[in-house]
Amino acid sequence: MSALLEVEHLAARLPVEGELRTVLHDVSLSIAAGEAVGLVGESGSGKSMTARAVARLLPSGAQADGAIRFDGKDVAALKGGGLRDYRGEVAMVFQDPRAHVNPVRTIGDFMVEALRALRGVDRGTARKRAVAALADVGIPEGERRLGQYPHELSGGLLQRVMIATMLLTEPRLVLADEPTTALDVTTQAEVMAILDELRRERGMALLFITHDLELAGAVCDRTSVMYAGSIVETRESAKLHDDPLHPYTASLATARPTIDASVRRLAAIPGRPVSAFEAPEGCAFAPRCAYAQDRCRATRPPIEALDGGLVRCARAEELRGRLTEKVVNHG
Amino acid sequence: MADELVLEATGLRKAFGDVVAVDGVDLAVPRRGSLAIVGESGSGKTTVAKMIVGLEAPTAGTIVACGRDRSAPARGAKERRRRGGEVQIVFQDPYSSLDPRHSAVQAVDEVLRLHRPDMDKGARAARVAELGELVGLDERQLRARPRALSGGQRQRIAIARALAADPQVVILDESVAALDVSIQAQILNLLADIRERTDISYILISHDLAVVRQITDEVIVMHRGKVVERGGTADVLDHPRQPYTQLLRASVPRPGWKPARGPRATTEEGSVA
């Protein structure tokens, strides 16, 4: 399978209070057609910025380096009609649907706008397709919904409208940025099921951004874990939880309480997550890592292949298989 | 449990016009106990919390805290202050629940001045330092404005501020929901430590069943204003009896979990939110 999306050594800097601050550093990932890739991290890890860079939606004044290729085309070089086509092929779903819809326009206006602008479809046909797309995401009576305003719909329903809207242009890649974080758990399960089903039926590729390791593991084939603007581990999702390669991934998994048992103390990670521009020399995670040595603090490790995954840790090989063990003793 | 109850609510009901948000809720919290109120948006769990702290007046029912009735709104500042000394609340969002112009020292000292008239300036300063240490804030963080602090550090201030009133009950209204995973674990450990070291009781309002499992002993599950299931936390989560609790339990992502479109996908959510 050749990659649909290829990101190579992506770096990005944003202007903050007059100076450029690094938000991404050496991010590489690839997604094949129909594949679901998870991007997991805490606040400031750069997961949303990665998606925004791919969508060509970085804030103004941002500087990006590295290569982003979609279907072999250089995304940075797209403009005019080429960029417009790209926006039809790569769709984005955000965390808070209410912040991304015009509150004074109806659902119908919102849904058909992209179809008419990007695909030149006439209004009647566009509305028919919108009703069909609503049915696909489990919303009956589409015709009535098209006449409603965003405030008349619940968060879960509105998020499904966003997904239906994005489907209209038949994108080949969906960038979903915490699409279920603001939803109730039962609604989250439904929205995830819909995304998963659509992906399988239509062969859409999915970049799924979340802070929830378990959720990424459940819906993605592969998952990358980000910390301080870099990817620290990429691995088959099924192995991420029980057989992690990076100490950060291991501690993320054990810091979360589980529904099956309470523990006397959670294995909390000391300190707080840092952004790329605050990261120290050497390994960005070293100040919080139980395994850090002098060499970890001296040089930033490159990302390297190990056991079918990729990991950015100088001690990854010698720690192989010991990460979960130690954490168990902790708990 | 035959322990002394620090909080008891009976037949609690709240109607907003025609909408009944809370419908006949009973709950009891023993001293040093920890009770979870679980439910999704619109279940009425936050309205219950607001009635307990006195931010909403119940339409019907009684609330007794520390042996004193608080079913009707407090009359006068003195009564309000006394109630504040019994039950405190920590909100979800530490970015909007603190005064941006007040450092942690000022925020905590303000509560001490109100609730501990017996303390002089020196005693208050000592208590601020003690609370700072209890919640894990250093000298520099205690003097900083909230703007300069992270979400986890701000939530520590909110907890210190709640504890400054020496309450018997602290209501944690989704207090760890907005925190990063690694910070959430620190705050959950902190809450467990505080419970171990003091006589405090918790009421945790949450939709996160893993958090509920970690820091509560008993749970009530609310759905559309009513309690649908109650019992020991471990028992209810391991063997949920009601279909709604079973659905909640099944919706939590875990290794091997496959999201499923529920039976209500096309029906219940069709109503206007």
Language model features with spans:
Chain A
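P-loop NTP-binding/switch modules centered on Walker-like glycine-rich loops
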Residues: 56, 175, 179, 183-264
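ABC ATPase NBD coupling module
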Residues: 59, 75-91, 109, 117, ...
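Conserved ABC transporter NBD signature motif
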Residues: 63-74
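Conserved ABC ATPase signature
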Residues: 148-153, 157
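A short, proline-enriched helix->beta-strand linker immediately N-terminal to the Walker B motif
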Residues: 168-172
